[in-house]
A protein has these predicted regions:
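Helix-turn-helix
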Residues: 15, 23-57, 61
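Amphipathic alpha-helical packing segments from all-alpha helical-bundle domains
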Residues: 71, 75, 118-152, 162-163, ...
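Amphipathic alpha-helical segments used for helix-helix packing
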Residues: 87, 101-126, 179-187
Length: 214
């Protein structure tokens, strides 16, 4: 009986987190009401507050969950010993595929970090499992060595590994972060936007790697 109660409680907490994630990602912390989350989760507000004392606690839990999904496996790919060209293609495929399934995620993350700068460290920890101080040496070390070797061989223009990563991620994330503007400016409906993103799987590796050739 106790095991059944514990499982039911766990299911309820997960249902609340699922509802909170959906609502926070669409509306942001400022635009979200606890009553809306309770209704989406199918619980009353008293039970909601039993699991999460206040909106801030629930917002932090929802943000951490969203942060884990922002760069699925990207950090591991960048830090790996794989060939540089393959890393670029893999990162692009991972990001475009994931963001196509979660198109509101970049706008939510950007908005939360802008209004709650302290969540930047939370984002890094959730995505990488590292502190901001450990991130550079652990993630960028291999990339730095690969770039330096390519530059020395005359196969690549010099670029800081930090710029390499930021430029690559920006090319993937930007169309989703400002999707309404992109669609309005280019006259795209949702179907054409999806086709546009599908083409970027081929266009981005060629563009990014071509820009680094000497």
């Amino acid at each position: 009986m106790k095991q059944l109660k514990k499982k039911k409680d766990g299911d309820t907490e997960q249902r609340i987190l699922d509802a909170a994630h959906a609502v926070f990602v669409r509306r942001g912390t400022a635009g979200t009401r606890m009553q809306e989350i309770a209704a989406a989760a199918g619980v009353n507000q008293a039970l909601l507050h039993y699991y999460f004392r206040n909106k801030e606690q629930l917002a932090r839990a929802a943000f951490e969950r969203a942060a884990r999904g922002l760069m699925p496996a990207v950090v591991q790919v960048i830090a790996s010993d794989g060939e540089l060209e393959e890393k670029v293609r893999r990162v692009i495929d991972l990001e475009l595929d994931h963001l196509s399934r979660a198109p509101y995620l970049p706008g939510y993350i950007i908005g939360e970090v802008t209004h709650h700068p302290e969540r930047a460290a939370q984002l890094i920890a959730a995505v990488t499992g590292l502190t901001p101080q450990d991130l550079g040496p652990r993630v960028l070390g291999t990339l730095r060595r690969q770039i330096e070797a390519r530059v020395k061989a005359g196969a690549m223009r010099p670029i800081a590994p930090e710029s390499f990563v930021v430029n690559l991620m920006a090319l993937c994330i930007f169309p989703f972060a400002v999707r309404p503007m992109v669609q309005a400016m280019l006259g795209m409906d949702d179907r054409r936007f999806a086709q546009f993103i599908a083409r970027r799987h081929e266009d981005l590796p060629a563009f990014f790697l071509g820009a680094l050739r000497p």
